[in-house]
C-alpha cells in the first residue's frame, strides 16, 4: 500500500527533526557550560578578593603583634625614662651597596620624625640616627658609619670618648669609642653609654660592651672596639626617639 502523503512527509522529516533536536540540545548544553564557566569565574574572583582581604588582615595582625612585643620589651626602659617619646617603626628597606648597613624606616615627618632623631632597638640600644626624613619614611645612619658621632662614656670608669663607626670593623657589626686616654682603665666587657653632650642624643642610651682595646695609630690614645647591644645589620624593628 502506498503511504499517505502525511506519513511520507513525517518519515522524510524525521532525520531533520532528530538533527534539530540534537543541535538544539547541543546549543542548550553549550549555553549551560558558558553560564557555568561565568559562575565559576565570578566565584573565583570572589574567592580571590576574600583571600586578599585575609592576607591583608594577617599582615596587619603580624604588625600589631610585633609592635606589642616590642613595646613590652621597652616597658622597663620607658618607665625609667618617661620624658622620652618613642615611635614604633619597621625597617622597609636596606641599601645593598651601603657598607655601613644604613636602613629605611616606615615613619616620616607626618609622624613627627625629624633629622637627627636617635633610633634605638626594642631593648633600648642605640642603632643610629635619622639623616633623611620624608613624609612617610626616613633613612637611618647606623653607629657603624664613620660619619656617625655621639659623645660616649664607659659607665664603670667614666672615661669619655666619641662613639663612631669604622670601615675596619663595620663588616663585623662593631663600632668604636675613640679618644680614650692611652693609660685608660677601661677593660673588656665594660658597658658604654651616651653622655648627652651636644644635645643630639639623650644621656645614658645603651650602646654596647667593650670587646677589645687597641692603641690609636699615633700611640697617643686608645680605641675601644664595641660590640653593639643590638646588631644594626639585622634589626627589623626600631623605635625613633622623637623627643626627650
Where are these regions (language model features)?
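A secondary-structure micro-motif
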Residues: 1-28, 32, 39-42, 55, ...
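N-terminal helix-turn-helix
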Residues: 43-53
